[in-house]
Amino acid sequence: MYTPIPQSGSPFPASVQDPGLHIWRVEKLKPVPIARESHGIFFSGDSYLVLHNGPEEASHLHLWIGQQSSRDEQGACAVLAVHLNTLLGERPVQHREVQGNESDLFMSYFPRGLKYYREGGVESAFHKTTSGARGAAIRKLYQVKGKKNIRATERPLSWDSFNTGDCFILDLGQNIFAWCGGKSNILERNKARDLALAIRDSERQGKAQVEIITDGEEPAEMIQVLGPKPALKEGNPEEDITADQTRPNAQAAALYKVSDATGQMNLTKVADSSPFASELLIPDDCFVLDNGLCAQIYIWKGRKANEKERQAALQVADGFISRMRYSPNTQVEILPQGRESPIFKQFFKNWK
């Protein structure tokens, strides 16, 4: 059990201190808890908070941003993250996760992979898919990508969405088909099967029929839903590499000091390239470690830095990404002093 924290006026329950995984969807600027059986299901139109409390009070707080989520929703998610982080005594390492570019740590919470819905919000298809009474009316198609980090993304219900190099899941409610392209490999096929079984168990209470389909042996029910099967395009192997890649640790990183002495957040470069001297990290300040060319930005928060600087860490990261014209998919990791990751430490030549 984590150290009790005052809950006065908090939108989060006292259980946020419990070990394990906690997930909230941002809904009308409030956090709405996600039931355990729905963990791993994300809507592209929404933003989420994912908190993992591990042993020895080692917490990680992830902000998951859907590709179609609004700026208002993303802003509300950031505000709630600041509140939750403060509630937990600023212990968590914070991460910004963008749909389709999640970190390996985030993916490790969901061993059966992630499933993305195109729709989002309270009135979305989420309620339809969890309702057994409407199970027969469900018609959804998912493309399964990645050999290590599995992501299932909802696609238009058409043969045009298929290719011969990937696996797809056609969810018809009472029947779930895992279709495997002729050029997909055995690992991908096994992952597609596992994901189809996970849909059956979590969304149909184990009562749907799962069938593995080989390219060219489509049953009549698939043809009835999708129409006559045309010649299919080939897959793109680069997409699997992107889904599975672990971003390299570039040596050409830079280090910036964050200051609000003028009333605004300003950045001053203190080192042009790594490895850096660890003495550059002063406990009274916050710093940006720029590894943006490898799609990664780190914010280090000194334990004596003022509250405004610490709480603005995510805002500083977003502004830095825009200023440097980095990809919006750039991952952000916010590290309190004393919670530095091994990857972060590799940028320093004399870490103690």
Curated annotation (Swiss-Prot):
<keyword id="KW-0539">Nucleus</keyword>
<dbReference type="InterPro" id="IPR007123">
    <property type="entry name" value="Gelsolin-like_dom"/>
</dbReference>
<dbReference type="GO" id="GO:0051015">
    <property type="term" value="F:actin filament binding"/>
</dbReference>
<feature type="repeat" description="Gelsolin-like 2">
    <location>
        <begin position="150"/>
        <end position="190"/>
    </location>
</feature>
<dbReference type="GO" id="GO:0030027">
    <property type="term" value="C:lamellipodium"/>
</dbReference>
<dbReference type="GO" id="GO:0005634">
    <property type="term" value="C:nucleus"/>
</dbReference>
<comment type="similarity">
    <text>Belongs to the villin/gelsolin family.</text>
</comment>
<dbReference type="GO" id="GO:0045335">
    <property type="term" value="C:phagocytic vesicle"/>
</dbReference>
<feature type="short sequence motif" description="Nuclear localization signal">
    <location>
        <begin position="139"/>
        <end position="148"/>
    </location>
</feature>
<dbReference type="Pfam" id="PF00626">
    <property type="entry name" value="Gelsolin"/>
</dbReference>
<keyword id="KW-0117">Actin capping</keyword>
<dbReference type="GO" id="GO:0051693">
    <property type="term" value="P:actin filament capping"/>
</dbReference>
<keyword id="KW-0009">Actin-binding</keyword>
<dbReference type="GO" id="GO:0071346">
    <property type="term" value="P:cellular response to type II interferon"/>
</dbReference>
<feature type="modified residue" description="N-acetylmethionine">
    <location>
        <position position="1"/>
    </location>
</feature>
<comment type="function">
    <text>Calcium-sensitive protein which reversibly blocks the barbed ends of actin filaments but does not sever preformed actin filaments. May play an important role in macrophage function. May play a role in regulating cytoplasmic and/or nuclear structures through potential interactions with actin. May bind DNA. Uncapping occurs either when Ca(2+) falls or when the concentration of polyphosphoinositide rises, both at low and high Ca(2+).</text>
</comment>
<feature type="repeat" description="Gelsolin-like 1">
    <location>
        <begin position="27"/>
        <end position="75"/>
    </location>
</feature>
<dbReference type="GO" id="GO:0001726">
    <property type="term" value="C:ruffle"/>
</dbReference>
<keyword id="KW-0007">Acetylation</keyword>
<comment type="subunit">
    <text>Interacts with NUP62. Interacts with NUTF2 and RAN; involved in CAPG nuclear import.</text>
</comment>
<keyword id="KW-0963">Cytoplasm</keyword>
<dbReference type="InterPro" id="IPR029006">
    <property type="entry name" value="ADF-H/Gelsolin-like_dom_sf"/>
</dbReference>
<feature type="modified residue" description="Phosphoserine">
    <location>
        <position position="341"/>
    </location>
</feature>
<feature type="repeat" description="Gelsolin-like 3">
    <location>
        <begin position="265"/>
        <end position="311"/>
    </location>
</feature>
<keyword id="KW-0597">Phosphoprotein</keyword>
<dbReference type="GO" id="GO:0030031">
    <property type="term" value="P:cell projection assembly"/>
</dbReference>
<keyword id="KW-0677">Repeat</keyword>
<keyword id="KW-0966">Cell projection</keyword>
<dbReference type="InterPro" id="IPR007122">
    <property type="entry name" value="Villin/Gelsolin"/>
</dbReference>
<protein>
    <recommendedName>
        <fullName>Macrophage-capping protein</fullName>
    </recommendedName>
</protein>
<dbReference type="GO" id="GO:0042470">
    <property type="term" value="C:melanosome"/>
</dbReference>
